[in-house]
Amino acid sequence: MDDTSTLTDVKEYPDTEVQKNRVLTLEEWREKWVDGKIGFHQEQGHQLLKKHLDTFLKGENVLRVFFPLCGKAVEMKWFADRGHCVVGVEISELGIREFFTEQNLSYSEEPIMEIPGAKVFKSSSGNISLYCCNLFDLPRVNIGKFDRIWDRGALVAVNPGDRKCYTDIMLSLTRKGFRYLLAVLSYDPTKHPGPPFYVPDAEIKNLFGSTCNIHCLEKVDVFEERHKSWGIDYIVEKLYLLTEK
């Protein structure tokens, strides 16, 4: 879309009622993977991340990069190939195994002692570790702190009632001087229940504003044919860079 004024003027809906009580269970997310309903996965990686990669990495080497609700994001391999250390968390064991298989990476797995039934999958190279567990259980495990967080398909997937808890966990994982790249979606939430959920600017300020500088890097029209089935006629992706205040 070339009409930047249209993107700038995307209507903001009050995020108080429409999707407030919407809840997806962990089992429902697992079923999406089993049923192949993973339209959120991007086989070619995220184009806005590619475009703003230098801004995100800032020329630094050997960074620790966290991927919340990572799925089988191909960007994890990108960062690992650049010498960074990648840690992700994902509820679907199938998604994690598919990542290693599709990226032709050998790996090992071991139980996470602090979380019954949970596992961690580690690449043989040692710089990719994916935790298969509920993200909200993650504070029970010492996974260290991170220089970078790539939040695409995570905040927009968390049940709206859990956002504050989610944000607290994310910020607790950041190191001094962190850079947090956040992708969210704007559409008419009265027409689609989510997920992905609608996250307005005001919500981002409410969640992150007290501890982070918030800068919107770009807004792009990402409407595709498949979105018509959601009952919407537009969808805009916004990319934010959050930095330490």
From Swiss-Prot:
Its main location: cytoplasm. Its EC number is 2.1.1.67. S-adenosyl-L-methionine binds at residues 29-40, 69, 90, 152. InterPro entries: SAM-dependent_MTases_sf, Thiopurine_S-MeTrfase, TPMT. SUPFAM superfamilies: S-adenosyl-L-methionine-dependent methyltransferases. Substrate binds at residue 40. It is found in: Cytoplasm. GO terms for cellular component: cytoplasm. It is an enzyme of class 2 (transferase). Keywords: Acetylation, Cytoplasm, Methyltransferase, S-adenosyl-L-methionine, Transferase. It catalyses: S-adenosyl-L-methionine + a thiopurine = S-adenosyl-L-homocysteine + a thiopurine S-methylether. Gene3D superfamilies: Vaccinia Virus protein VP39. The modification N6-acetyllysine is found at residue 58. One of its GO terms (molecular function) is thiopurine S-methyltransferase activity. PROSITE patterns: SAM_MT_TPMT. GO terms for biological process: methylation. Monomer. Belongs to the class I-like SAM-binding methyltransferase superfamily. TPMT family. This is Thiopurine S-methyltransferase. It comes from Felis catus. The gene is TPMT.
